[in-house]
Amino acid sequence: MFNKRNLKWLSVLATIIMAFVQLGGALVTKTGSEDGCGSSWPLCHGALLPQNLPIDTIIELSHRAVSGLSLIVVLWLAITAWKHIGYIREVKPLAIISIAFLLVQALIGAAAVIWQQNSYVLALHFGISLISFSSVFVLMLIIFEVDKKYEADELYIRKPLRRLTWIMTGIVYLTIYTGALVRHAKASLAYGGWPLPFHDIIPHTEQDWVQFAHRGMAFITFFWIMITFIHAVKNYSENRTIRYGYTTAFILIILQVITGALSVMTNVNLFIALLHALFITILFGMIAYFIMLMLRTIRSEKIK
């Protein structure tokens, strides 16, 4: 017999596991464990469990195990949600997107191991996995009926905020890509101090340019989210969904900037680097929820 509470717990479990997939991928890259299993996939050094287990192999194996578990749990969630609450318009598309992008993410990860892709291709891996995470995250919010609790199901988002949010989505995604590129191009400590090198602000190497591009995009992202936040709070002060949602997004980008700066200042402290990945993961999940709300508004306009 179907129990809504069980579906809630399943959605929370899937969201947490997907967050660990994101953090695990960041951990693999930050610790240089990409080749921990050699060029074997799905096996590790040609075996299910190799006899020799150095730390890079353990990290890579753990990431693969969590990724495999995420596929099982997300598939379980997608099927259950489809069957029992598929009447909610967004549930079926979100279920399809979560599974599809999880599979694409796995294929890119496998290709990276087997064929050793370049940094610019590898950087797509994190962004694609974020889309899958965001789908699961939004699905969880729907299951918990956040819409009804905060009157989001009756919300009308006017065009100015929609434009600001669409542009914010593109800017944030580009920033995520450049951030992933920083990791894969081994450019975390390139381009000197933060926010700019004191001795020479002109980038010289490819790593310098990658780091420079990421900092530039981060700067644009921070100010654009701040502008969007101010507009949202000023014009939708009566609506808790907008007020709480965009305030959370602004807090997350502040934390993202702080951890980004601390990563440079601490020579990429692993804990800070993982927090950096976690904050952007949650932020993108919030943006995905904003997109769902905007699409509802657009559909309501077409009906009228």
Swiss-Prot record:
Its EC number is 1.17.99.9. Residues 1-8, 89-93, 145-163, 237-244, 292-304 are cytoplasmic. Heme o binds at residues 63, 125. GO terms for biological process: heme A biosynthetic process. It is found in: Cell membrane. It catalyses: Fe(II)-heme o + 2 A + H2O = Fe(II)-heme a + 2 AH2. Disulfide bonds join 37-44. The keyword Magnesium does not apply. One of its GO terms (molecular function) is oxidoreductase activity, acting on NAD(P)H, heme protein as acceptor. Residues 30-67, 115-123, 185-215, 266-270 are extracellular. Keywords: Cell membrane, Disulfide bond, Heme biosynthesis, Iron, Membrane, Metal-binding, Oxidoreductase, Transmembrane, Transmembrane helix. The chain crosses the membrane at residues 9-29, 68-88, 94-114, 124-144, 164-184, 216-236, 245-265, 271-291. It comes from the Bacteria. Its cofactor is heme b. InterPro entries: COX15/CtaA_fam, COX15/CtaA_HemeA_synthase, HemeA_Synthase_type1. Heme b binds at residues 214, 276. Interacts with CtaB. Belongs to the COX15/CtaA family. Type 1 subfamily. The N-half (TM1-TM4) and C-half (TM5-TM8) domains are connected by an intracellular loop. Each domain is formed from four-helix bundles and they align in a pseudo twofold symmetry manner. The N-half domain is the substrate-heme O binding domain and the C-half domain is the cofactor heme B binding domain. HAMAP family: HemeA_synth_type1. This is Heme A synthase. The lineage of its organism: Bacteria, Bacillati, Bacillota, Bacilli, Bacillales. The gene is ctaA.
